């Protein structure tokens, strides 16, 4: 699979962290699939997060948002 060049804002992220990747979130002790990576402003708190990572459990479920530095690659199956 040939991937498209990363947007400039994403170029400082580790190469394994991209949309569609399976990752592990130690804060929730869960594996998830990366749905989107981008800048995000929480509408409730007005706090801004650069390169927020939107995750969803494999197989579906409720999405959550984490900072990229909080994640690691998921173990191989």
Predicted segments, located by residue:
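A short, compositionally biased micro-patch
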Residues: 26-27, 48, 58
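Short solvent-exposed loop/turn micro-motifs enriched in small/polar/acidic residues
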Residues: 15-16, 48, 64
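Short beta-strand-centered aromatic/proline hotspots
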Residues: 29-43
């Amino acid at each position: 699979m040939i991937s498209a060049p990363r947007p400039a804002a994403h170029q400082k992220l580790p190469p394994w962290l991209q949309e569609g990747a399976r990752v592990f979130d130690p804060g929730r002790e869960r594996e998830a699939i990366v749905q989107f990576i981008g800048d995000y402003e929480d509408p409730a708190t007005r706090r801004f997060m650069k390169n927020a990572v939107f995750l969803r459990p494999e197989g579906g479920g409720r999405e959550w948002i984490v900072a990229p530095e909080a994640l690691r690659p998921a173990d191989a199956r």
